[in-house]
Protein backbone atom coordinates (compact mmCIF):
# COMPACT_ATOMS: atom_id res chain seq x y z
CA UNK A 1 0.00 0.00 0.00
CA UNK A 2 1.58 3.38 -1.00
CA UNK A 3 2.18 5.98 1.64
CA UNK A 4 -0.34 8.84 1.78
CA UNK A 5 2.46 11.36 0.99
CA UNK A 6 3.81 9.44 -2.04
CA UNK A 7 3.46 10.76 -5.57
CA UNK A 8 0.39 9.67 -7.47
CA UNK A 9 1.07 7.42 -10.48
CA UNK A 10 -0.88 6.74 -13.60
CA UNK A 11 -2.67 3.37 -13.97
CA UNK A 12 -0.44 2.36 -16.89
CA UNK A 13 2.70 2.82 -14.80
CA UNK A 14 1.23 0.79 -11.92
CA UNK A 15 0.45 -2.08 -14.30
CA UNK A 16 4.02 -2.14 -15.66
CA UNK A 17 5.52 -2.24 -12.15
CA UNK A 18 3.19 -5.10 -11.09
CA UNK A 19 4.13 -7.13 -14.15
CA UNK A 20 7.84 -6.57 -13.50
CA UNK A 21 7.57 -7.64 -9.84
CA UNK A 22 5.60 -10.85 -10.61
CA UNK A 23 7.76 -14.03 -10.47
CA UNK A 24 8.67 -15.49 -13.84
CA UNK A 25 7.60 -19.10 -14.44
CA UNK A 26 10.19 -21.12 -16.27
CA UNK A 27 8.46 -22.97 -19.06
CA UNK A 28 11.34 -25.43 -19.38
CA UNK A 29 10.95 -26.86 -15.85
CA UNK A 30 9.89 -30.48 -15.60
CA UNK A 31 7.60 -29.94 -12.57
CA UNK A 32 4.35 -31.81 -12.98
CA UNK A 33 1.49 -29.85 -11.50
CA UNK A 34 -1.73 -31.60 -12.51
CA UNK A 35 -1.95 -34.25 -15.16
CA UNK A 36 -5.48 -34.88 -16.36
CA UNK A 37 -4.47 -38.21 -17.85
CA UNK A 38 -3.20 -39.54 -14.49
CA UNK A 39 -5.79 -41.55 -12.56
CA UNK A 40 -7.29 -39.65 -9.66
CA UNK A 41 -7.10 -41.23 -6.20
CA UNK A 42 -10.20 -43.11 -5.26
CA UNK A 43 -12.37 -41.24 -2.82
CA UNK A 44 -14.38 -43.55 -0.65
CA UNK A 45 -17.50 -42.24 0.96
CA UNK A 46 -18.31 -43.77 4.32
CA UNK A 47 -21.90 -44.04 5.28
CA UNK A 48 -22.93 -44.22 8.89
CA UNK A 49 -23.65 -47.69 10.07
CA UNK A 50 -27.03 -48.46 11.50
CA UNK A 51 -25.42 -49.43 14.81
CA UNK A 52 -23.72 -46.03 15.16
CA UNK A 53 -26.70 -43.89 14.23
CA UNK A 54 -27.80 -41.62 17.04
CA UNK A 55 -31.50 -41.29 17.71
CA UNK A 56 -33.11 -38.76 19.99
CA UNK A 57 -36.14 -39.38 22.15
CA UNK A 58 -39.02 -36.99 22.82
CA UNK A 59 -37.08 -35.12 25.52
CA UNK A 60 -34.03 -34.66 23.32
CA UNK A 61 -31.86 -37.28 25.02
CA UNK A 62 -29.69 -39.41 22.75
CA UNK A 63 -30.54 -43.09 22.32
CA UNK A 64 -27.72 -45.41 21.34
CA UNK A 65 -28.04 -48.96 20.12
CA UNK A 66 -26.45 -51.59 22.41
CA UNK A 67 -23.00 -52.87 21.57
CA UNK A 68 -22.95 -56.27 19.96
CA UNK A 69 -21.15 -59.00 21.87
CA UNK A 70 -17.73 -59.82 20.47
CA UNK A 71 -15.35 -62.62 21.22
CA UNK A 72 -12.69 -60.68 23.10
CA UNK A 73 -9.53 -61.93 24.67
CA UNK A 74 -9.90 -63.79 27.95
CA UNK A 75 -7.47 -65.06 30.57
CA UNK A 76 -7.58 -68.62 31.83
CA UNK A 77 -7.52 -68.90 35.63
CA UNK A 78 -7.07 -72.08 37.64
CA UNK A 79 -7.98 -73.11 41.17
CA UNK A 80 -7.01 -76.28 42.96
CA UNK A 81 -9.14 -77.29 45.96
CA UNK A 82 -7.54 -80.00 48.14
CA UNK A 83 -9.81 -82.78 49.37
CA UNK A 84 -9.16 -84.48 52.74
CA UNK A 85 -8.62 -88.25 52.57
CA UNK A 86 -11.81 -89.04 54.49
CA UNK A 87 -13.88 -87.00 51.98
CA UNK A 88 -12.57 -88.68 48.81
CA UNK A 89 -15.09 -91.54 48.93
CA UNK A 90 -18.10 -89.22 49.46
CA UNK A 91 -16.74 -87.01 46.66
CA UNK A 92 -16.62 -89.94 44.24
CA UNK A 93 -20.11 -91.03 45.23
CA UNK A 94 -21.61 -87.54 44.87
CA UNK A 95 -19.57 -86.49 41.81
CA UNK A 96 -22.54 -86.86 39.38
CA UNK A 97 -24.36 -84.22 41.46
CA UNK A 98 -21.34 -81.95 41.99
CA UNK A 99 -20.02 -81.18 38.52
CA UNK A 100 -23.29 -80.28 36.66
CA UNK A 101 -23.86 -76.98 38.54
CA UNK A 102 -20.22 -76.00 37.98
CA UNK A 103 -20.25 -76.79 34.27
CA UNK A 104 -23.79 -75.76 33.31
CA UNK A 105 -24.42 -72.85 35.68
CA UNK A 106 -20.95 -71.30 36.13
CA UNK A 107 -19.53 -72.43 32.74
CA UNK A 108 -16.34 -73.78 34.35
CA UNK A 109 -14.11 -76.68 33.40
CA UNK A 110 -13.86 -79.19 36.26
CA UNK A 111 -11.95 -82.38 36.87
CA UNK A 112 -11.28 -84.59 39.88
CA UNK A 113 -7.59 -85.39 40.24
CA UNK A 114 -7.46 -88.64 42.20
CA UNK A 115 -3.67 -88.76 42.25
CA UNK A 116 -3.22 -85.38 43.93
CA UNK A 117 -6.55 -85.70 45.82
CA UNK A 118 -7.88 -82.36 44.64
CA UNK A 119 -10.61 -80.85 42.49
CA UNK A 120 -9.27 -78.58 39.75
CA UNK A 121 -11.33 -75.69 38.38
CA UNK A 122 -10.56 -73.62 35.29
CA UNK A 123 -12.33 -70.81 33.46
CA UNK A 124 -13.15 -71.01 29.76
CA UNK A 125 -14.21 -68.67 26.98
CA UNK A 126 -17.84 -69.38 27.90
CA UNK A 127 -17.41 -68.14 31.48
CA UNK A 128 -19.30 -64.87 31.87
CA UNK A 129 -19.40 -64.34 35.65
CA UNK A 130 -16.19 -62.83 37.03
CA UNK A 131 -16.78 -64.48 40.41
CA UNK A 132 -17.57 -67.91 39.00
CA UNK A 133 -14.21 -69.37 39.98
CA UNK A 134 -14.50 -68.18 43.59
CA UNK A 135 -18.07 -69.49 43.85
CA UNK A 136 -16.98 -72.86 42.52
CA UNK A 137 -14.13 -73.02 45.03
CA UNK A 138 -16.47 -72.16 47.92
CA UNK A 139 -18.89 -74.85 46.76
CA UNK A 140 -16.20 -77.55 46.71
CA UNK A 141 -14.79 -76.39 50.06
CA UNK A 142 -18.23 -76.57 51.64
CA UNK A 143 -18.58 -80.17 50.50
CA UNK A 144 -15.11 -81.09 51.78
CA UNK A 145 -16.01 -79.62 55.17
CA UNK A 146 -18.92 -82.04 55.45
CA UNK A 147 -21.97 -80.16 54.16
CA UNK A 148 -24.48 -81.94 51.97
CA UNK A 149 -24.42 -81.26 48.23
CA UNK A 150 -27.91 -79.73 48.27
CA UNK A 151 -26.88 -77.34 51.06
CA UNK A 152 -23.56 -76.43 49.42
CA UNK A 153 -25.28 -75.60 46.11
CA UNK A 154 -26.91 -72.64 47.89
CA UNK A 155 -23.48 -70.96 47.81
CA UNK A 156 -23.75 -70.86 44.01
CA UNK A 157 -27.23 -69.36 43.94
CA UNK A 158 -27.05 -66.84 46.79
CA UNK A 159 -24.39 -64.20 47.39
CA UNK A 160 -24.99 -63.50 51.09
CA UNK A 161 -24.05 -66.93 52.45
CA UNK A 162 -20.89 -67.57 54.44
CA UNK A 163 -19.12 -70.38 56.26
CA UNK A 164 -17.79 -69.82 59.77
CA UNK A 165 -15.50 -72.32 61.46
CA UNK A 166 -14.38 -72.41 65.08
CA UNK A 167 -13.16 -75.00 67.56
CA UNK A 168 -14.51 -75.92 70.94
CA UNK A 169 -11.22 -74.99 72.60
CA UNK A 170 -11.67 -71.45 71.26
CA UNK A 171 -14.69 -71.13 73.55
CA UNK A 172 -13.49 -73.13 76.54
CA UNK A 173 -10.47 -75.41 76.97
CA UNK A 174 -11.91 -78.87 77.57
CA UNK A 175 -10.21 -82.25 77.65
CA UNK A 176 -11.18 -85.87 78.03
CA UNK A 177 -14.72 -86.63 79.04
CA UNK A 178 -15.62 -82.95 79.40
CA UNK A 179 -14.92 -82.47 75.68
CA UNK A 180 -17.07 -85.48 74.79
CA UNK A 181 -19.95 -84.19 76.92
CA UNK A 182 -19.77 -80.79 75.24
CA UNK A 183 -19.96 -82.40 71.78
CA UNK A 184 -22.87 -84.54 73.00
CA UNK A 185 -24.75 -81.46 74.28
CA UNK A 186 -24.34 -79.76 70.88
CA UNK A 187 -25.53 -82.79 68.92
CA UNK A 188 -28.23 -83.97 71.32
CA UNK A 189 -29.95 -87.33 71.25
CA UNK A 190 -30.15 -88.53 67.63
CA UNK A 191 -29.05 -85.04 66.53
CA UNK A 192 -32.15 -83.40 68.00
CA UNK A 193 -30.36 -80.36 69.42
CA UNK A 194 -28.37 -79.73 66.26
CA UNK A 195 -31.50 -79.92 64.11
CA UNK A 196 -33.32 -77.53 66.46
CA UNK A 197 -30.48 -75.01 66.14
CA UNK A 198 -30.49 -75.35 62.34
CA UNK A 199 -34.25 -74.91 62.02
CA UNK A 200 -34.46 -71.96 64.41
CA UNK A 201 -31.50 -70.06 62.94
CA UNK A 202 -32.02 -71.19 59.31
CA UNK A 203 -28.45 -72.44 59.05
CA UNK A 204 -26.62 -75.72 58.52
CA UNK A 205 -24.22 -77.02 61.18
CA UNK A 206 -21.50 -79.65 60.79
CA UNK A 207 -19.79 -81.22 63.81
CA UNK A 208 -16.37 -82.44 62.72
CA UNK A 209 -14.75 -83.70 65.94
CA UNK A 210 -13.62 -80.53 67.75
CA UNK A 211 -14.38 -78.22 64.81
CA UNK A 212 -17.80 -76.71 64.15
CA UNK A 213 -18.77 -75.36 60.72
CA UNK A 214 -21.82 -73.13 60.25
CA UNK A 215 -23.28 -72.26 56.83
CA UNK A 216 -25.77 -69.41 56.50
CA UNK A 217 -26.31 -65.68 56.47
CA UNK A 218 -24.41 -63.28 58.72
CA UNK A 219 -27.16 -62.79 61.31
CA UNK A 220 -28.23 -66.42 61.17
CA UNK A 221 -24.67 -67.59 61.83
CA UNK A 222 -24.51 -65.36 64.90
CA UNK A 223 -27.72 -66.85 66.31
CA UNK A 224 -26.48 -70.42 65.80
CA UNK A 225 -23.05 -69.59 67.21
CA UNK A 226 -24.53 -68.10 70.38
CA UNK A 227 -26.62 -71.22 70.95
CA UNK A 228 -23.64 -73.54 70.41
CA UNK A 229 -21.41 -71.44 72.67
CA UNK A 230 -24.03 -71.61 75.43
CA UNK A 231 -24.10 -75.40 75.16
CA UNK A 232 -20.29 -75.58 75.29
CA UNK A 233 -20.22 -73.41 78.42
CA UNK A 234 -22.62 -75.82 80.14
CA UNK A 235 -26.09 -74.33 79.67
CA UNK A 236 -28.86 -76.96 79.80
CA UNK A 237 -30.50 -77.73 76.45
CA UNK A 238 -33.92 -76.66 77.74
CA UNK A 239 -32.73 -73.11 78.33
CA UNK A 240 -31.11 -73.00 74.89
CA UNK A 241 -34.37 -74.22 73.31
CA UNK A 242 -36.25 -71.39 75.00
CA UNK A 243 -33.81 -68.80 73.72
CA UNK A 244 -34.05 -70.26 70.21
CA UNK A 245 -37.86 -70.04 70.29
CA UNK A 246 -37.64 -66.39 71.30
CA UNK A 247 -35.15 -65.62 68.54
CA UNK A 248 -37.21 -67.53 65.96
CA UNK A 249 -40.36 -65.58 66.84
CA UNK A 250 -38.48 -62.30 66.53
CA UNK A 251 -37.16 -63.32 63.12
CA UNK A 252 -40.70 -64.14 61.93
CA UNK A 253 -41.95 -60.73 63.11
CA UNK A 254 -39.05 -58.99 61.38
CA UNK A 255 -39.51 -60.71 58.03
From Swiss-Prot:
Component of the small ribosomal subunit, ribosomal RNA processing complex (SSU RRP complex). InterPro entries: KH-I_PNO1_first, KH_dom, KH_dom_type_1_sf, KH_PNO1_2nd. Required for small ribosomal subunit (SSU) synthesis. Has a role in the processing of early nucleolar and late cytoplasmic pre-RNA species. One of its GO terms (biological process) is ribosome biogenesis. Its main location: cytoplasm. GO terms for cellular component: cytoplasm; nucleolus. It is found in: Cytoplasm; Nucleus, Nucleolus. Residues 176-228 form the KH domain. Keywords: Cytoplasm, Nucleus, Ribosome biogenesis, RNA-binding. It comes from Coccidioides immitis (strain RS). This is Pre-rRNA-processing protein PNO1. The keyword Cytoplasm applies. The keyword Membrane does not apply. Coiled coil: none annotated. Residues 1-31 are annotated as: Disordered. Pfam families: KH_PNO1_2nd. CDD domains: KH-I_PNO1_rpt1 (cd22391), KH-I_PNO1_rpt2 (cd22392). Belongs to the PNO1 family.
